[in-house]
Amino acid sequence: MRTVKALLVIPLMTAVTTMTATAQPPPAPASLRLYVFDCGRLEGGDVSRFRLAPQEMATTDMSVACYLVVHPNGTLIWDAGAVPDSDIERANANGTSRRYRLVLPNGAERFVTATRTLKSQLAAAGYTPDGITYLALSHYHYDHTANANLFAASTWLVRPVEREAMFESKPPDLLQPSTYSALRRSTVIAITGADYDVFRDGTVVLKSSPGHTPGHQVLFVKLAKTGPVVVCGDLYHYPEERTLNRIPTFDADEKQTAASRAALDVFLKQTGAQLWIQHDFSANAKLKKAPGYYE
């Protein structure tokens, strides 16, 4: 694997030659769009891991959301869900609400209720996985990577420390390597700075926010009508983490998490951006879903 200085680029030699013919995507919009996909409902389980108690919370369940950013100069998928599309297809359950049991490599079990494949939701918006320009994951945990392999032909925007951990011989807990194994051969832009301006116009920015994982990042989207939005990955899981100032026990570095949250608070005040907590079940339920979009 060849690396290049600065923003490291790891070429995927077969991306163009092996890509299958697909339907043409919709014409590029005149202004930025943000699509929200329903990628399931994750049962929270033991919330003491988040230093919370059930009686302090509106719900212990979490939404699992994925997002598509459509820019006049390209597209970006943000996070890839918890249940692989292949599991839904194998159960012949696309369009049917079904509870899935996920078993992680360390033997831990998680339960997610999902209804539709990510591919079918993309298709409803007019897109296919192999037509997406960029893939960016907030971080490497299983409930954000389930369909990452679908986007192996996209350019992967990732921080080196995160990528290295994903392909270690013994990856950290809460990873599901089979869901992202194809990314090993993907074209990579390795982000070495705090911010990465995806389309070079300030409207779509990946911001470093380490702590939950070493290379965790959040997504800033500057929408013309909706206004600026920060989609925060797992910097917070529950809104009560924010209001009660609780940090999960399993974060890689709690001091980094606290610093990242403080830095984001400053950024939110400076920009007036809304904070979208991806796992906030109640808030996510109120968001319009694809094929509707925010602009």
Where are these regions (language model features)?
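Positively charged n-region of N-terminal signal peptides that target proteins for export
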Residues: M1-A6
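Bacterial N-terminal signal peptides
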Residues: L7-T18
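Metallo-beta-lactamase
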Residues: M19-G131, R159-S208, T226-G233, Q256-Q274, ...
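Active-site gating loops and adjacent loop-to-helix segments of metal-dependent hydrolytic enzymes
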Residues: A91-A108, H237-N245, D251, G292-Y294
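Active-site metal-binding motif and surrounding structural segment of the metallo-beta-lactamase
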Residues: A91-V158
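Short, electropositive alpha-helical surface patch
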Residues: L137, A285-E295
